[in-house]
Curated annotation (Swiss-Prot):
Protein name according to UniProt: Triosephosphate isomerase
GO BP, sorted A to Z: gluconeogenesis; glyceraldehyde-3-phosphate biosynthetic process; glycerol catabolic process; glycolytic process
The species this protein was found in: Albidiferax ferrireducens (strain ATCC BAA-621 / DSM 15236 / T118) (Rhodoferax ferrireducens)
Lineage, uppermost ranks: Bacteria, Pseudomonadati, Pseudomonadota, Betaproteobacteria, Burkholderiales
Pathway(s) where this gene product acts: Carbohydrate biosynthesis; gluconeogenesis; Carbohydrate degradation; glycolysis; D-glyceraldehyde 3-phosphate from glycerone phosphate: step 1/1
Gene this protein is translated from: tpiA
Intracellular or extracellular location(s): Cytoplasm
Catalytic activity, EC: 5.3.1.1
Subunit structure: Homodimer.
Residues holding substrate: N9, W10, K11, G171, S209, G230, G231
Reaction(s) catalysed (UniProt annotation): D-glyceraldehyde 3-phosphate = dihydroxyacetone phosphate
Catalytic residues in the record: H94, E165
């Protein structure tokens, strides 16, 4: 039985004071959760959040890492650096990185490989745009994106988390229907099963505007193993509600 994973993606939000208040609220509410909880925070706040999360069941996560191990790559952050701060999860290939930073499938696969090499679980994001969905290309797109990661990481694919994030549902308030979300998760599960005998242990989480109102129904689906939560992860009551739905 796969445990549910609820990962908060703070994106480019937060401040020292706000972070402290948020994590303190979560510390009280999460307790000894039976599901897995992570916070993927801006890199400048990793040290602060590492200290704030000591003694909790909440794992620390990052939002990106370099595909390079070390070297003259100004502005980049390596997996080894993240590892020193106790980072356990790292988002790779988020649609905002693909869109605004022109990250390709091959680059995302290389970043996932680098995370795994550093003992960090990559949360590999895949998803289609509205135009791709309306053109009937959803399955083609998500399978292509995931195939690159499978090809680059081979037997290690069982160590990743996959996040399906319909791009048209991120930050828009729109959500894929329960049926749409489960259908894509099922496609991804089948692709993983063809690639690994351990596919049934791989968590596939949903990242398209999961919130307190829709979390329970989404998380009840057989192939939805958690959520990559954006805006709702910045609000203690909402994030705790989603965690409760998963646990």
């Amino acid at each position: 039985m796969r445990k549910k994973l609820i990962a908060g993606n703070w994106k480019m939000n937060g401040s020292l004071a706000a972070n402290e208040a948020l994590v303190k609220g979560l510390r009280v509410g999460v307790g000894a959760s039976v599901c897995q909880v992570a916070l993927c925070v801006p890199s400048v706040y990793l040290a602060q959040c590492q200290a704030l999360l000591v003694g909790t069941a909440i794992a620390l996560g990052a939002q990106d890492l370099s595909q390079h191990e070390v070297g003259a790559f100004t502005g980049e952050i390596s997996g080894a650096m993240l590892q020193e701060f106790g980072v356990r999860y790292c988002i790779v290939g988020h649609s905002e990185r693909r869109q605004y930073h022109f990250e390709t499938d091959a680059l995302v696969a290389a970043k996932a490989q680098r995370a795994l090499a550093c003992g960090i679980t990559p949360i590999v994001c895949v998803g289609e745009t509205l135009a791709e969905r309306e053109a009937g290309r959803t399955e083609e797109v998500v399978k292509r994106q995931l195939a690159a990661v499978i090809h680059a990481n081979g037997h290690c694919i069982s160590e990743v988390v996959v996040a399906y994030e319909p791009v048209w549902a991120i930050g828009t308030g729109k959500t894929a229907s329960i049926e749409q979300a489960q259908q894509v998760h099922s496609v991804l599960r089948q692709q993983l099963q063809a690639a690994s005998i351990q596919a049934d242990r791989i968590q596939i989480i949903y990242g398209g505007s999961m919130n307190a109102a829709n979390a329970a129904e989404l998380l009840a689906q057989p192939d939805i193993d958690g959520g990559l939560v954006g805006g709702a992860s910045l609000k203690v009551p909402d994030f705790l509600s989603i965690i409760a739905s998963a646990c």
